[in-house]
């Protein structure tokens, strides 16, 4: 199954807020056209919606998500917590959380177009797994710096997670440690995803 490129507001209306998918918000009037019917939600639907929330927020394909669940199952600790840590330590997500991109798809594009350096080397793989003490910078080219500068200036200044630090003047981010579960950007029940 390929990456989702369709209408984003449809997914937001169905699944709730997904900050990584889009920075826009649907108008409140458009939500009232089709109010949620009081239909009993089955257990399967609840689990499926949690899995889809995770998939669309991080911009994963079905196969990528299954691979991450498999890796998390083999690791020590709670499978759900390890899964969320793996997803949060992806390069595209870290760029989004640092404020260098407005959405995770925007961060993917920055990485794919070779604007981002990790420890002084160009990385063009959005799923690159960042490690503690990784330094994330932009290329020295004026175009790369201008893109990041626009994103940083236009993004709302949210509280930065404690596992990341940013120097917005040098366009440099630092991964301090593995993310703690309370700083994860998406409110989700990870056990339902693993059970699915």
From Swiss-Prot:
Keyword match Ribosomal protein: yes
Its biological purpose: One of the primary rRNA binding proteins, it binds directly to 16S rRNA where it nucleates assembly of the body of the 30S subunit.
Limits of the S4 RNA-binding domain: 89-150
GO molecular function, one term: structural constituent of ribosome
Cellular component, GO, one term: chloroplast
SMART domains: Ribosomal_S4, S4
Quaternary data: Part of the 30S ribosomal subunit. Contacts protein S5. The interaction surface between S4 and S5 is involved in control of translational fidelity.
Similarity comment: family membership: Belongs to the universal ribosomal protein uS4 family.
Keywords attached to this entry: Chloroplast, Plastid, Ribonucleoprotein, Ribosomal protein, RNA-binding, rRNA-binding
Signal peptide (from-to): none
Location in or out of the cell: Plastid, Chloroplast
Residue ranges crossing the lipid bilayer per the database entry: none
One of the GO biological process terms: translation
Organism: Agave bracteosa
Region (Disordered): 15-36
Coiled coil start-end: none
A Pfam family matched in the record: Ribosomal_S4
Protein name: Small ribosomal subunit protein uS4c
Major subcellular location class: plastid
